[in-house]
């Protein structure tokens, strides 16, 4: 047999392995949903099942790809080179082992979900620090370990036999006519293998933005369905990824006395009993004559600064017409540039719910976040000023555990896509209009109450599925005027159309709220920028800046300088200074925007009067010391608690 024959034969067996494991994971996924189907919420449709299987299939391409790659490297490649290489036997052992392991993991998952209402999660890490004997006894007496494990092994052996039979099926003989034909067929195979490899790497997509991965897999209005999307390898990888992040960021290499020195450097009270209390602020003047009953903060998905800037004035006049109208109002103030907490939505949410600077640790996965309140978090600051706090999310509360995290951090109520009409919803949740409509209904049902509404939108995000024509978007009104950084392509117009939609629905919502409560106060900002597809490289402000708009009766423009800047979590103390009364106190790590800092920073960028910069290693040493102090205090607060 020549090498081409051996290679194509091995490749066919690899393809059969690919098909086998894709079917196996899909079967396990379906069986898992069926097993717990009684837990599905009312209104779950067959289409939700199919979406789960589809997203799961795409995500499992990563796992399937790794298994098949092991067979390709261990069997197909050496078998092509060496005639007597035992490739068939090696491939069989790889596939048999993988089939057996994933069958046993599936049985374990069934019991695990019964206990934790989740597939494998961070409780695995916590369990490693637990009483192993107690865990073993619990498994035996409560969850049938002694009969479930043998059953899993028996079923695994049966499925493994099916695997061998399936992969052992006959293969087709491929030949070539001459050397030219060999080169042609080899090139075609190389291209096909490369495309399949990319699709496996990115979960059925050609790039990361459109991929399905464990971090964005929670796309359905059911915890069960969202957990079913993850196969067991991806669920375990989730645990590994989160733990790796924690370990890399949780090394505290300073003492409690050094912590106090850092607090002192930032102007905190080292004699306070807690870190939060060390950064207590007293409101020195009442800024708004009438305290608003309704306070609304809109954290807009990918709501970026660039359409507000002079350089992009022509497209921005239409794309963010509503946001610009708020800025133009005499009852508003705004920053020239605001630095986002991070480059994703969850870092932004973490920042606002904790009031701490970004430290590459996800507080929403930390035990401290579920034991005690962060006094510097936006919900607790607003509660201390007398407001009921409500979190609104256009997506699903199971995403990043945002429901549990927000409720643990001072929000009185939480509403997500599952609580709202599913009009035009997609994998990420309901359209912004449906979200805002639900909030308006809530406001009408609770007249006169002092309520702080924290709103996290979703529509300005792939897959960009809003019916823009029905929503009223007119692409002819987007004036690019030969702008070289933005191309008028269908995809670009679709992106900008969703940008317009997010801004438009927000503006309509603001007007509707004013009709309910004319004295309402609004804060409009973005979770991050850095998502829009520019045709060419752009400056840092264009790429990464977000707006921060404060709008409501009694606000004065002169309260913020035209060239003011800040970092996202400074919105928290600024809001407290606006709605609070003279003499009231609140806790905040950073000062408000009314007390300008010499510089501002986020996870990557920094800004001062000289400009906006990318690399923090180039900042002055005095700045570095302050940044280090903020980060170390935040790290201590998240990992070791509040006590001083």
For each of these PLM feature ranges, what is it?
Residues 238-271:
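Extracytoplasmic/periplasmic/luminal assembly and interaction segments
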Residues 86-89, 248-257, 365-370, 588-590:
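Short alpha-helical "patches" and their helix-cap loops
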Residues 2-247:
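Transmembrane and membrane-interface helices of multi-pass
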Residues 6, 10, 124, 131-134, ...:
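Exposed alpha-helical structural elements
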Residues 156, 162-172, 259-279:
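Short, intrinsically disordered, low-complexity segments enriched in Ser/Thr and Pro
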Residues 24, 129-133, 230-233, 256, ...:
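Alpha-helix initiation and N-capping motif
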């Amino acid at each position: 047999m020549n090498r081409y024959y051996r290679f194509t034969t091995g490749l066919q067996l690899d393809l059969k392995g690919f098909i086998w494991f894709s079917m196996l994971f899909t079967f396990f996924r379906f069986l898992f949903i069926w097993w717990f189907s009684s837990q599905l919420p009312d209104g779950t449709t067959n289409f939700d099942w199919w979406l789960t299987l589809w997203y799961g299939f795409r995500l499992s391409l990563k796992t399937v790809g790794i298994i098949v790659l092991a067979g390709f490297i261990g069997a197909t490649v050496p078998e092509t080179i060496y005639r007597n290489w035992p490739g068939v036997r090696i491939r069989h052992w790889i596939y048999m082992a993988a089939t057996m392991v994933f069958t046993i993991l599936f049985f374990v998952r069934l019991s695990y979900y019964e206990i934790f209402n989740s597939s494998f999660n961070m409780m695995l890490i916590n369990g490693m620090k637990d009483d192993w004997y107690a865990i073993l006894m619990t498994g035996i007496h409560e969850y049938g370990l002694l009969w479930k494990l043998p059953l899993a092994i028996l079923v695994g052996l049966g499925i493994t036999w099916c695997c061998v039979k399936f992969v052992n099926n006959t293969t087709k003989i491929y030949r070539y006519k001459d050397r030219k034909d060999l080169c042609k067929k080899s090139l075609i195979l190389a291209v096909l293998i490369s495309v399949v490899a990319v699709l496996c790497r990115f979960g059925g997509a050609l790039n990361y933005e459109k991929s399905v991965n464990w971090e964005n897999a929670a796309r359905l209005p059911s915890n069960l369905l969202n957990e079913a999307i993850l196969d067991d390898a991806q669920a375990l990888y989730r645990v590994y990824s989160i733990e790796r992040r924690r370990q890399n960021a949780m090394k505290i290499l300073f003492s409690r006395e050094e912590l106090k020195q850092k607090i002192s450097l930032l102007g905190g009270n080292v004699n306070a009993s807690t870190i939060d209390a060390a950064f207590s602020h007293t409101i020195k003047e009442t800024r708004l004559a009438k305290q608003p009953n309704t306070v609304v903060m809109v954290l807009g998905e990918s709501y970026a600064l660039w359409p507000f800037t002079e350089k992009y004035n022509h497209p921005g006049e239409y794309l963010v017409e509503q946001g610009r109208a708020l800025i133009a109002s005499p009852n508003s103030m705004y920053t020239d540039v605001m630095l986002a907490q991070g480059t994703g939505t969850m870092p932004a949410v973490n920042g606002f719910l904790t009031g701490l600077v970004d430290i590459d640790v996800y507080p929403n996965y930390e035990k401290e976040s579920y034991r005690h309140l962060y006094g510097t978090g936006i919900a607790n600051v607003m509660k201390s000023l007398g407001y009921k706090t409500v979190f609104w999310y256009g997506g699903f509360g199971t995403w990043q555990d945002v429901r549990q995290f927000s409720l643990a951090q001072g929000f009185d109520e939480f509403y997500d896509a599952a609580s709202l009409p599913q009009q035009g919803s997609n994998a990420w949740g309901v359209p912004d209009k449906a979200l805002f409509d639900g909030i308006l209904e809530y406001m009408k049902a609770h007249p006169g109450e002092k309520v702080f509404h924290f709103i996290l939108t979703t529509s300005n995000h792939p897959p960009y599925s809003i019916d823009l024509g029905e929503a009223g978007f007119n692409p002819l009104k987007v004036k690019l005027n030969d702008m070289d950084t933005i191309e008028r392509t269908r995809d670009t117009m679709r992106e900008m159309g969703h940008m317009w939609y997010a801004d438009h629905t927000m503006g309509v919502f603001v007007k509707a709220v004013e009709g309910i409560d004319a004295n309402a106060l609004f804060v409009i900002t973005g979770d991050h920028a850095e998502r829009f597809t520019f045709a060419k490289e752009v400056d840092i402000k264009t790429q990464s800046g977000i707006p921060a708009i404060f709008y409501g009766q009694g606000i004065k423009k002169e309260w913020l300088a035209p060239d003011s800047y800040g970092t996202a979590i400074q919105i928290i103390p600024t809001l407290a200074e606006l709605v609070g009364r003279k003499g009231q106190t609140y806790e905040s790590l950073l000062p408000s925007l009314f007390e300008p800092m010499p510089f501002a920073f986020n996870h990557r960028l920094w800004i001062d009067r000289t400009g906006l910069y990318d690399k923090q290693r180039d900042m002055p040493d005095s700045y570095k010391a302050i940044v280090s102090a903020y980060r170390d205090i935040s790290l201590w607060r998240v990992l070791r608690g509040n006590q001083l």
